[in-house]
Each structure stands twice: as structure tokens, then as C-alpha cells.
Amino acid sequence: MRKEKLITLNDRGNEMTFKIREMPAMKLESWLARAGLLLAGTGAFDGKEVATPGDAIQKAGAMLSQGGISALANIDYEKAQPLLDDLLACCSRVDAGIEQKMTPETVDGIIEDVRTLFALRKEALLLNMGFFMGGESSVIPSDGTPSPEQSKPRISVRSRR
């Protein structure tokens, strides 16, 4: 069974629940290989031994789990966009028990705050790459009553395996 977790985000005063689901193994391997090739093209692995494609995948996973999405900062956006879209595809909005898949085409009709989009991609990355670093979440538990002065979306997590 794929790992998944439910998170609640405050999107400009609206509490929204999202389900983050782990990518299937083959898709994740492909994602890591593409990320590894893009990172290698930026010189990110210079000075680090990469003898096999598996080494590139391991190094890419380690870089992404340590640096998060910022590890992709030196990659042209057009090349990184499919990777970001794949992370978004791991996310669904859950409302009254109904899941709505997040896609580049639907996201603007669901969320308003770009920080919510960043938080979703970050949590999808953590869920998928967490095994490289032990899978510790960086989310802030929500007590269900966010204050209006909060500058960042608040997140609460419920995990199921």
C-alpha cells in the first residue's frame, strides 16, 4: 500500500484538507533519474563520484531530501516544471470525503495562496524522498484555530501506511 498522509493547510483563512500520496515505485525511480540527470547537467555532482545510474539516483535523492525543492534551483524552469507537476500530481484536495486531484489545470480553482502550492510540493517531496533521510516531517501541527496574523500556512498531519 502506498504511503499517504492528510494535511490541513490554511489557505488565506480557508482551512483545506489535502491527501498526499506516494508515487508508485517505477514512477519515483523515473522521477529520481530525471532529477539526477538534470542536477548532473548543472554540475551539482562535480567532485562526487557517480559510477552508475543508480549512484546518480541515490545522490539526487539525497540532495533533494536535504535541500528540498531548492536543490532544483539551478535547473531551467522549463526543465524542472515536469518534476514539479509530478509532485503536484501526488496531491488531492479532500472535501466532504471527495478527492479532487491537483493538476496544473485545476490548482488555480482550488487554492489562492502560492505558499499553499509550495507547501503541497514540499510535503509530496518529503513523503516520496523521506526514506533517504529518515522521513522526518517539517510540518507545524495545527490546533485547528489558526490566527489571522500567521504569515505561513499551518499544517497538521495524519499519516496512514
Which residues make up each language-model segment?
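Generic structural motif
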Residues: 10-12, 23-25
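Short, surface-exposed, charged amphipathic helix/loop patches that serve as local interaction elements
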Residues: 2, 25-161
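Short linear motifs in exposed loops
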Residues: 19-21
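Short acidic, Pro/Gly- and aromatic-enriched capping/linker segments at domain boundaries
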Residues: 1-10
